[in-house]
Amino acid sequence: IPLRGAFINGRWDSQCHRFSNGAIACA
């Protein structure tokens, strides 16, 4: 289940999603 938002370069980006396999997808 992807989480809403992810830390990118130390900043929280609510448009990004971190998946359980470690992948990050940004809208």
UniProtKB/Swiss-Prot annotation:
Tissue: Expressed by the skin glands.
Impact reported for residue 20 to A: Decrease in antiviral activity
Gene Ontology CC entries for this record: extracellular region
Principal location listed in the UniProt entry: secreted
Consequence the record notes for mutating residue 26 to A: Decrease in antiviral activity
Resulting phenotype, residue 15 to A: Decrease in antiviral activity
Keyword tags: Amphibian defense peptide, Antiviral protein, Pharmaceutical, Secreted
Biological processes per GO annotation: defense response; regulation of defense response to virus
Misc. comment: The name urumin is given by authors from the word 'urumi', which is a deadly whip sword that originates from the same geographical region as H.bahuvistara.
Summary of the function given for this chain in its UniProt record: Amphibian peptide that shows viricidal activity against human H1N1 influenza A virus. It specifically targets the conserved stalk region of H1 hemagglutinin, and acts by actively destroying influenza virions. It shows a reduced activity on human H3N2 influenza A virus and no activity against other viruses (HIV, SIV, HSV-II, hepatitis C, Ebola, Zika, and Dengue viruses). In vivo, the peptide also protects mice infected with mouse-adapted influenza virus from lethal influenza infection. The peptide synthesized in D-amino acids is inactive.
Name under which the protein is recorded: Urumin
Organism annotation: Hydrophylax bahuvistara (Wide-spread fungoid frog)
Lineage of origin: Eukaryota, Metazoa, Chordata, Craniata, Vertebrata
